[in-house]
Amino acid sequence: LAEAEIEYADDPCTTLFVKFPVRDDKGKLTPYAPLDKIFFVIWTTTPWTIPGNMAICVNAAFDYVLLQAPGGEVYILAKDLAENVCKAAHIDYTACKVLATLKGGEFELMTAGHPLFDRDSVILCGDHVTLDAGTGCVHTAPGFGADDFNICRAYDAAGKTHIGTPVPVNAKGVMTDEKYSGQFYAKANEVI
């Protein structure tokens, strides 16, 4: 078929912002705020892949802000996306305070707590991270995407990490992780 012969249908999807609490900041973030108040924030259109999250990717060359929201939580977001993220999350951007601006490369190999399980997600740098949409912090589940798999394997091959590749969904689209076991992946979006 020629491109002109293909009709695309809009497929509405669930989107989600997810906070990952910083666990190990390599001593770089605590001068600005207490560690228990700092979060990497990702945005995803595939919440059902969150159980497979093993990393968060940032772009080493981008500017990221530590944005303190009303209430005291501090969010790590790409500087160029911060205002849009606040608007989408119903946070008054004008009431927020930028505590610091850092290059994405400064976050490399920090860790954040997984939002659903007692394990860490490591922070990696990848050129596939863009400023087109989202937060500038990309949810990375190596069992669910080529970019995710390739960046995790590259870090493993370089001896920098030892990232697993969980695939908590079987060939029929049914969740296999015990917490969501038996649910069809699209239904798991609502629970996750």
What are these regions (language model features)?
Residues L1-V41, T49-I50:
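Active-site cores that bind ATP or allylic diphosphates and position pyrophosphate for catalysis
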Residues L29-V41, P47-I192:
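Non-cofactor substrate-recognition interfaces
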